[in-house]
Amino acid sequence: MNIDIAETFTHDNLRNIYLTNFALSKVTGVDNILPLHFSKNQSKEIDTIVSKVFFNEYKFTRYKEKLISKGANKFPRQIAIPTLRDRIVLKAINNYLQKNFSEKLNIQVPQQATRDVKSSLMSGQYETVIKIDIQNFYPSIVHNKLVQVLESFGVEKDAIILIEQAISTGFHKNQNNLVGVPQGLSISNVLAEMYMSEIDRKMDNKNIFYKRYVDDVLILCSKNDSDGIYNKFKFEANCLGLEIHENDPKSDKTTIKHIREEFSYLGYIYNPKPYDENINISIRESSRKRFQDSVAALFTAYANAGKKRSKALLFWKLNLRITGCIANNKCKGWLFFFSEIDDMRMLFEMDNMIKKLCERHNVEYKGVKKLTRAIHEIKHKKWNNNYFPNFDSYNFKSMKEVVSYDRGIAPHKLKLSDQDILNAFWSIINREIRSMETDISSFS
């Protein structure tokens, strides 16, 4: 059932958004307001939001800037962090857009996109693979063109006014951008999908396989059609003010290859060389190294902890890194993300690397979980068993154990109220999930 913007910006709905999504958050914008402070004036703050939105007077505060490395010789990704009040408003807008228009969009998680690619490769229908990367995608989205797209979807004028306010806000006072959607906002992804929807529709053709995940495009087609299809996508992108990386055999950004040649997409390597023909899908070396470095960092932290060194904490963090977890009813972690690989040789090598790290640091390997077993459990849909921690089902005793590991205190010496333990537990879990997500944050 569709909802309008007036139904979205009610006191009760905004309060529910705050309590569900942000009440335990420790992230702050430029005003440094935490939920602890916001909660003291929660009712008044929410009433102010409702009033200002109703009269089209709501203004966003400039965003805090966070830079995320994309690797050597690359400009970092610029992430916008809104204030708590703005995050509530943005989440409400996102909910409005998702509930009303998501059925008109083809939004997929990377794993499903990868399964579709695998299926099409195995069909034997195609001869050529075209991989296209859009340059500076989010910073290049033209606002007036985006507004036209939103209007064509039927987005209400009051919602468009709010969206324009949000995307024109920058990192400096009085900044009024006309181009670019800040990355990191809860509305960024759905706006990008709506912006690209017309290209997706025009590229839909029964004679080709077309897949786009944000700014990464993969097309499978016949050899004779490849140049024309490539030029068509380039033309349509240019019409939206977007530029693509030019076809360059020496680059991995945009390429046109025979379908049996090695190529990468969404962090996966297809037809990897020089492995044998039994391996169809592996992962990029950079993705593998990022995971290995994160595991090695756990042992380094353990070695440097001195008197606070805890094998229990090391085992907990290490096994969590290896298997991933279930939290907030979602599968999280490196192996869940790359669950479509069939490169068991690589996983055996990584298990062996972890074993050697244990030996080097005099840590018993017996209690360490295995990537090779975890991938088997995932592929056979057995990840609901005890091999993977399901934090949603943890009882109070288990939560207390996690908090005690993290603080280096025996559970019986932990002097916290039940609510404090609950808050501390989810703060730890969210911290570890964010840390795991950095292992897969850059796959394009």
Name each model-derived stretch.
Residues 32-36, 44-50, 119-120, 124-131, ...:
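Charge-rich, low-complexity segments
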Residues 119-214, 218-242, 246-262, 307, ...:
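Conserved polymerase palm-domain catalytic core
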Residues 76-105, 177-205:
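Conserved pre-motif C helix in the palm subdomain of viral-like polymerases
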Residues 51-74, 160-171:
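Reverse-transcriptase-like RNA-dependent polymerase core
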Residues 4, 89-142:
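Active-site-proximal segment of RNA-dependent polymerases
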Residues 2-62, 69:
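A structured, charge-rich N-terminal accessory region that forms the first stable segment of a protein
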Residues 266-444:
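Active-site and adjacent loop segments of nucleotide-processing enzymes
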